[in-house]
Each structure stands twice: as C-alpha cells, then as structure tokens.
Amino acid sequence: MGSSSSTALARLGLPGQPRSTWLGVAALGLAAVALGTVAWRRTRPRRRRQLQQVGTVSKVWIYPIKSCKGVSVCETECTDMGLRCGKVRDRFWMVVKEDGHMVTARQEPRLVLVSITLENNYLTLEAPGMEQIVLPIKLPSSNKIHNCRLFGLDIKGRDCGDEVAQWFTNYLKTQAYRLVQFDTSMKGRTTKKLYPSESYLQNYEVAYPDCSPVHLISEASLVDLNTRLKKKVKMEYFRPNIVVSGCEAFEEDTWDELLIGDVEMKRVLSCPRCVLTTVDPDTGIIDRKEPLETLKSYRLCDPSVKSIYQSSPLFGMYFSVEKLGSLRVGDPVYRMVD
C-alpha cells in the first residue's frame, strides 16, 4: 500500500496494516451507518451539515447501452434512476436474447467495442467490421414490449426494431439478439428485490444498471491497484459514472453523503467486482484473471457482510441520488458531515 494511502487511513482513524483489518472496519462501518438510515430518504427534516471538500470530479461517463462503450460528457443531470444527458439515460438500453435474458460483456466480451455517439434524437452505433447504424431515441409506442430477465429479476423493455437486432446478431455471430429500451412508465428494479435480506438500505429503483443509480471511483484507487499489477489497467475496465481526483486511495470507502454540484448522494454499498473487469475495453478480449485476482488478494469484505458481497472483491462505491440536480467535470466533491 502506498504512503499516500496510509496517510488517508491514518487521517480517517483506520490502521495502516493489515489491509484486511481496515477493510473489515470500513465494511462494518458501512453496515452500521446503513442501519441508521431507514427513514433518511426524503423523509427526515433537513439539518445543517458541514461540507468538507474531498476531491474534484475529473470524469463523467454515461453508458447508454449496458456493456457497450461509455460516452464521456462534461455535464450531466442526476435523476433518481441515474445519469441523464439530454434525452439519453445511463443504461436504459440492453441487449437481450430472444427469450428476454440479458446479455452483457460477461457472455459477449466484444460488446465493449460498440461505441455510441449522441446527436439530437438519435444514437449512432459503430463496431469493428460493421457499418454504423442510427437508432432513434424515441421509439414507436407500437413496438413490442418484452418481458426481460436481469440478474434473476423481471423487468420490461421496448423492442428497438429488427434492423438493430440484426446488427447486433451479425456483429456478435453467436445467436439471435434483440435490443430493448427501458422507459420511465415501466417499473424498475427496486432495492427490496435487489437486496431482499438487507432491509436497512434506502429505497430506490434502477433500470438496467447492476445495482444502483450512480457508480463512483477515485483515480487514486486505480493508481494503487496498478502498483500491484504486472499489466496496468485503465479506468474503463471498471465502468464508473463519476471519477474523482484529489483524494487518497480508497478514501471513497468512507464517504457516506456527498454533495456534487447541486446533487446530494447517499452511499448504498461498495461495488463487488466480477469477471467483467477482466474484459479489455480496447480489444474485447476476456482474460478471466486480472485485475480480478489481484483485487481478491487485498480487497475482500469483512466476514460480517459476506452475505452481501460473497467472495467478490470491492472496488468503487454505489450511490443513490437523494437530491436531484446536475453536476459537471471540475465540480468540487464535498463530504457532508453533521
């Protein structure tokens, strides 16, 4: 662990060694804080809180299609279901099999090579060896509604048409696929369904993201990880929405409530990592080992919260949006404290 990381731990009252010990303390702290927040979300009266700047927003990404390339933006709205740039929302589109089951880069790694351009009311998709295709953001209401399946939960999606379905089928060359779009008239996946045994978590809905409306990582945490890897990785391996500079490695583990721009966020959980992190975003090749194995060597959770994270290493944080608004690259990131 680097000296800057040790400084952060000392400042936060956590011991520098061993790593597993302070990770356990941080995880227990997360559970304790969450247990006290049942009635927090939009029900408690506003209280005066101090603001402590902990960093600066250095990057913002929106991922319109789940598992495809992210779109870097300078400014974004934060809705209760995640980021939005104009009419395009984060992970509101998803590739599915013909039976409605989701398809991600875990099964089709080359999805990460599909790039997306936002222009007016259209998405333009490009991929290696394929002609670009233009997809309207607003779909005809007559398009079929599919019953989809995402991590064992039911959710609906409106079919995006035969042309783009054939485009993905031709590109991936394994079986027939469809592209579906979520709209806000549909029912999202709720906290109670995502984590039925964790009743202390604040209530929110998501469309096609894995777990939460916002995913945040610090630059310093990636730097720390790269000191342990033979082959360095970049932030795109981890697909965050917000990247923060100016803090120390894994300091984001301790952030409970944040103010960025005029957006207030509440910590939900740490981000458990899976084999998707081993897909190279530049080649679409899945390694299945790194950086996941290295993360497992020093970023496992405390046994007390193993029911949530199992054997997945933790890297990055999930947040819910408590006060809607907008934020932009360059905004200070404030930790809100009593």
UniProtKB/Swiss-Prot annotation:
Its main location: mitochondrion. The keyword Zinc does not apply. Keywords: Acetylation, Isopeptide bond, Membrane, Mitochondrion, Mitochondrion outer membrane, Molybdenum, Oxidoreductase, Peroxisome, Transit peptide, Ubl conjugation. Signal peptide: none annotated. GO terms for cellular component: mitochondrial inner membrane; mitochondrial outer membrane; mitochondrion; peroxisome. Ubiquitinated by PRKN during mitophagy, leading to its degradation and enhancement of mitophagy. Deubiquitinated by USP30. Its EC number is 1.7.-.-. It is an enzyme of class 1 (oxidoreductase). InterPro entries: MoCF_Sase_C, MOCOS_middle, Pyrv_Knase-like_insert_dom_sf. One of its GO terms (biological process) is cellular detoxification of nitrogen compound. The lineage of its organism: Eukaryota, Metazoa, Chordata, Craniata, Vertebrata. Residues 1-35 form a transit peptide. PROSITE patterns: MOSC. Residues 188-336 form the MOSC domain. It is a peripheral membrane protein. There is a cross-link at residues 59, 138, 144, 156, 173, 187, 289, 296 (Glycyl lysine isopeptide (Lys-Gly) (interchain with G-Cter in ubiquitin)). Component of a complex composed of cytochrome b5, NADH-cytochrome b5 reductase (CYB5R3) and MTARC2. It catalyses: N(omega)-hydroxy-L-arginine + 2 Fe(II)-[cytochrome b5] + 2 H(+) = L-arginine + 2 Fe(III)-[cytochrome b5] + H2O. The gene is Mtarc2. GO terms for molecular function: molybdenum ion binding; molybdopterin cofactor binding; nitrate reductase activity; nitrite reductase activity; pyridoxal phosphate binding. Binds 1 Mo-molybdopterin (Mo-MPT) cofactor per subunit. It is found in: Mitochondrion outer membrane; Peroxisome. This is Mitochondrial amidoxime reducing component 2. The modification N6-acetyllysine is found at residue 156. Catalyzes the reduction of N-oxygenated molecules, acting as a counterpart of cytochrome P450 and flavin-containing monooxygenases in metabolic cycles. As a component of prodrug-converting system, reduces a multitude of N-hydroxylated prodrugs particularly amidoximes, leading to increased drug bioavailability. May be involved in mitochondrial N(omega)-hydroxy-L-arginine (NOHA) reduction, regulating endogenous nitric oxide levels and biosynthesis. The keyword Translocase does not apply.
